[in-house]
Amino acid sequence: MNVADIAMDLFRGAKGETISIFAIAKVTVTGVSRGLSKLVFGVVDQANLVNLGQYVVYSVVSMIYNITLHPLASFPGPVFWGASRWPSIWRLFKGRLVHDVHALHGQYGHVVRIAPNELAFSSAQAWKDIYGHKRGNNSMEEMPKFHKFYSGISKTPSIVSEPTRDGHRFIRRILSPAFSDKNLRELEPIVQGYISQFIDQLRSHCEDSTGSKVPLDLVSWYNSATFDIVGDLTFGRPFGSLEQGEEDPFIKDINHFAAVGGAMLIFTSHFPGRGILRFLASLGKVFQNGQEKHVTKMEESLVDRMKNKSSRPDIIDGLVKEKDGFQIDYDRVLENAAAITMAGSETTASQLSGLTALLLQNPNCLERLKKEVRSAFKSDKDITSTSSLVGVWQYSANHSPRNFTYPDEFRPDRWLDDRDQKEYEHDHGDAMQPFSVGPRDCPSQK
């Protein structure tokens, strides 16, 4: 007899009716607890023994239910992962969860059960089904979010942690102008300035006083650069790491906070309770200290920005500006500013660090990249000055032999789908733009 058959026998009464699993747990727990209490009475505290017995029996019965009768029991995945969340939590704290889930997808396919009530997907269609907009007759605009996880991030929700559709739409609408093409182009010179400062600092630190080469911690330098850039774009001033020539301790603290905090959020969202929180609090000093320093730094930057606002636009301008007689409260402004800082700095630094490591490990890719970059401009003189006048002359572009075969002949067949591919293979059809391109193209061209 297999496990499923045994479980089904447990859940059937003498007359064949199905018994509630929780009723079984209650009866079994009581019997086991009493028996154990009598066995070791006077040696172990009876109340604690009863609690232990209840926990053990309830856990066993729950696992049997999860692998036999649970609505997700038929989905592929390891038995122990489906029986309890502890296997995934254990791998989470070991830092192996992402890699182990990837291995499970290789074994079981695009859909894997990784916890009693959780499925992991890896297909392209799953992106649209889970996160995409719902269309047609479906009244639900998006799939509901897991409130226990989102509510654990912060008391005041940000654009990252807002679980409701209306709340997220509200914050997104306020922040959207800051990320428009026009606004980002206006901020581009600021970013370029910090990139130049970053490169200058690398050059000045890659040699010691004797002229010998010195290894650099690029992860630290990338963090310094990205935090300074995002700090200036968000609050109107950098955090000062590039100017100091070393990574600010604050950056290290909040990076540790982010790493530990992510694991703690997942854990507490599935295992709520005061005992769990006290246990994690005893282990999470890094998380607590990092969170406090992060909040303090964000508050200092926000207060300074609100007192000394320049005429230059920044990312949180829409959050602090009163509109239609309404202004967002301070806590929500602070929470969103902190979220933007984290989202735009550490993530970019991690990507650049990984990209650098992979390029160094793959010399052929590095050589190709170097060739593309260095062949674009041989010197600074090749870059057009910002004070110069530039424009595309349509007649020249349309009649250039570099753009079209037989440019001065009437050959409308060049635009047809059934054209002679070989004859017109060198044509650059996008060189002809009678309606212009960009934000000032003809609105009625289509």
UniProtKB/Swiss-Prot annotation:
Residues 403-446 are annotated as: Disordered. Residues 408-430 have a biased composition (Basic and acidic residues). Its cofactor is heme. Keywords: Heme, Iron, Metal-binding, Monooxygenase, Oxidoreductase. InterPro entries: Cyt_P450, Cyt_P450_E_grp-I, Cyt_P450_sf, Cytochrome_P450_monoxygenase. Its EC number is 1.-.-.-. Pfam families: p450 (PF00067). Heme binds at residue 442. Pathway: Mycotoxin biosynthesis. GO terms for molecular function: heme binding; iron ion binding; monooxygenase activity; oxidoreductase activity, acting on paired donors, with incorporation or reduction of molecular oxygen. One of its GO terms (biological process) is biosynthetic process. It is an enzyme of class 1 (oxidoreductase). Belongs to the cytochrome P450 family. Cytochrome P450 monooxygenase; part of the core atranone cluster (CAC) which products are predicted to catalyze most or all steps of mycotoxin atranone synthesis, starting from geranylgeranyl pyrophosphate (GGPP). The initial cyclization of GGPP to dolabellane is probably performed by the terpene cyclase ATR13. The Baeyer-Villiger oxidation near the end of the atranone synthesis, which converts atranones D and E to atranones F and G is predicted to be catalyzed by the monooxygenase ATR8. Of the CAC's other predicted gene products, the reducing PKS ATR6 might synthesize a polyketide chain. This is Cytochrome P450 monooxygenase ATR14. It comes from Stachybotrys chlorohalonatus (strain IBT 40285).
